[in-house]
Amino acid sequence: GIDLNGVLEESQKKALRNLLNEHEVLFFRNQDISPLHHKLLALSFGPIQTHPAYETVKGFPEITILESTAKKPSKIEAWHSDMTFKKHPPMATVLKSVIVPERGGDTLWASMTAAYEGLSSHMQTFLSDLIAVHDFSHGFKETLAEPGGRERLEDAIIMNPPVRHPVIRTHPETGKKVIFVNSLFTTHIEDLTRSESEEILNLLFKHIITPEFTCRFQWHPHSLAIWDNRSTQHKPINDYFPNHRRMERITIDGDNPY
């Protein structure tokens, strides 16, 4: 095992990165790490990228709070990769559990590498040169529809205009091809008609959640997950209302998908 509540040696950092490239998502139990060591763990993978819309841990603006309560239940339950509305989406995410419900609240992950490899060669070729648009506003449309929602997110909308990413990207470390569209932030594929774009995206959204491409993690107190945001998608399961769930997340800066 490994104790993440401390300073990692260079050999441990290298081992974690190699394991992440191989398995795409890593799970750890019994890691009661402080906010400082959460930050240091994330920094071992690269510079940190902040989120424009969520509350953060006091004294640690890098750590995003993801919280669901009876008064304010979580609204996001779609499959997605984190923050693909950015020109440089995060390369990885480090998420730790702080408060977990007695039952429910699991998270699902899907391998976009396996999903790509599960396509026919003809479909791989067809998708290879397509470009899709990702939009911050599309992912937060429920919040924007709330009273005062647009005013609260106005600055984030201005700072995050729609961006273009390849439908099929190349993983910069493994060289493998992955599907890089998601139902939360991807709005359409360029140079196709609206109906063509919708049909292709819906086909891909259905394909990527094929059970053979997925895994499921049951959170315990002080559990921690690290996932490769370039080659996976995930989905939180909101099946624990009205119970309380609080997670704390750090995203690590990535590159421009190609």
Report each predicted region and the residues it spans:
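Non-heme Fe(II) oxygenase catalytic core, chiefly the N-lobe of the double-stranded beta-helix
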Residues: G1-L224, N229-Y258
